[in-house]
Amino acid sequence: MSNKAWGGRFSEQPEDWVDEFNASIHFDKTLIQYDVQGSIAHAKMLAKQDIITDSDCDQIIEGLNAILKDYEQDNLELDTSLEDIHLNIEHELIKRIGDAGGRLHTGRSRNDQVATDMHLYTKAEVNALIELITQFQHTIVNTAESHINTIMPGYTHLQRAQPISFAHHILTYYWMLERDKSRFQDSLKRIDISPLGAAALSGTTYPIDRHETQSLLDFSAIYENSMDAVSDRDYIVETLHNISLTMVHLSRFAEEIIFWSSAEANFITLSDAFSTGSSIMPQKKNPDMAELIRGKVGRTTGHLMSMLMTLKGLPLAYNKDMQEDKEGLFDAVHTLKGSLRIFDGMIDSMTVNVERLQQTVYNDFSNATELADYLVNKGVPFRSAHEVVGKIVLWSIQHNIYLLDVPLEQYQSANELIEADIYDYLKPENCVSRRISYGSTGQSSVQQQLDIIHKELSD
C-alpha cells in the first residue's frame, strides 16, 4: 500500500530522487506550529458541526499538541516521501490515534490548509517585524536626542552642501522606517484573512462553518470566493515588497555608516562588537555588519522578483508552482529580522565623534549658501548674490582658505554690503540655528520633530 495521501490512483511509486525533488518538508517544517493551530481550529469546528464526534476531536487535539511538543524537543522524525509538513503531521497523527486522525481532513484540502498556514505565519512575522522596526526607531530617537546640537556637513552628490545637525540627519531614517512600518501595518488588512474551508477550490459539501474557524484563528476577515482563497498569493508578494523596501532603506543607512566610520571621514566609531578584522592586515577594523546588510538587499529583492515571476502565468486555482512561495518568504523574513537586530545594536553602541564633525564642517564651503542669503537680506537678488558668492568661493579656493578666513576687504571688494558681522553669521552652528522652516535642521524644528515622534511612538 502506498504511503502517499494520493497513492490510490497510481500503479507506480516515484523513485527517491523524484520524491526529493517534489518534497518541501525541508523548508515548510517552519509552518508546523501554524499547521497544528489551523488543524485544531478545524477539528473544533468539525465537532461543533457534528461532522466528527467530540471524542474524536479531543483525541485529535491531544495528538496534535503531542506531535508539536515532540517536534520542538527534536523527537519527531520527518519523512521526505510524505512530501510536506502537513502530510507528515497527518501520517503521524493517524499512527498515534488511529481512525480519529484520519477524520481530521474532512471538509479540507491541502490547498486551503497550506494557505491558512501561510496566512498565520505571515501575520505573525509581519507583527514581529513591526515590533523590531519600532525598537530600532527608539534607538534612532535616543541617538538623535543626544546630538541635537552636534553639527555636521550635509551632503548632496556626496559633496558637502550645507551644515546640518547630526540629529536631523539620523532622524531621516526614523521617517523612512515609519513609512516601512506603515506599509506593514496596512498590509495586515490583506494578510489577516481566513482561507480555511475553501477546500481544493470549490468549497465542500460538508456543513462546515468557515466563520467559526475564522473566529478560532483570530482572523479579522474571510475570503468570499473559494478559488481566490486558495490561489491568492498577493499578500506574500506585498510582504516581500515591504521587506525589500525596508532593506533598501537599511542599505542606504549602512552605506553612510560605512563611509562615516572610514578613516577619511572618521565621523563615528563602531563598537568592536559590530566590526571584524583582517586575516593579513592586523590594523584593520572593518564595518562588516553594515556591509552584509548592504549586500543582503539583492537577496530580498531577488525573492520578490522570483515570486512575481512564479505567479505571472498561473491559471486558477492551485498549481504546484505555488510551493515556491515559501523559501523566499521565509528567508526574506529571517534576513530583515536579523538586519534590524544588528542595526539596532550597531547604532546603540556606536560613538559619534563630535569634535571631528565640527572640525569638518568648519573646514569646508558648506556655509556658502548662508553668504548668499546674507546678501539677499540686504536687498541683493538671489541670482546676483549667487554669482557674487561663487566668485568669493573661487578666490578662497585659489588662496587655500575658507569663508571664515576671507579678509573683510576682500569681501567688500566683491560686494560693499558685506560687513564685519559676516563672520559670526557664517559660523556653522549659526547657519543651523537660523533654519526655522517646518521640518528643517534648526534645533527648534528638530525638537518639534522629536515631540511628534514621541507622540507617535506612545500611541
From Swiss-Prot:
One of its GO terms (cellular component) is cytosol. Its main location: cytoplasm. Pfam families: ASL_C2, Lyase_1. Belongs to the lyase 1 family. Argininosuccinate lyase subfamily. The keyword Amino-acid biosynthesis applies. Disulfide bonds: none annotated. It catalyses: 2-(N(omega)-L-arginino)succinate = fumarate + L-arginine. GO terms for molecular function: argininosuccinate lyase activity. It is found in: Cytoplasm. Pathway: Amino-acid biosynthesis; L-arginine biosynthesis; L-arginine from L-ornithine and carbamoyl phosphate: step 3/3. This is Argininosuccinate lyase. Keywords: Amino-acid biosynthesis, Arginine biosynthesis, Cytoplasm, Lyase. CDD domains: Argininosuccinate_lyase. It comes from Staphylococcus saprophyticus subsp. saprophyticus (strain ATCC 15305 / DSM 20229 / NCIMB 8711 / NCTC 7292 / S-41). Gene3D superfamilies: Fumarase/aspartase (C-terminal domain), Fumarase/aspartase (Central domain), Fumarase/aspartase (N-terminal domain). Its EC number is 4.3.2.1.
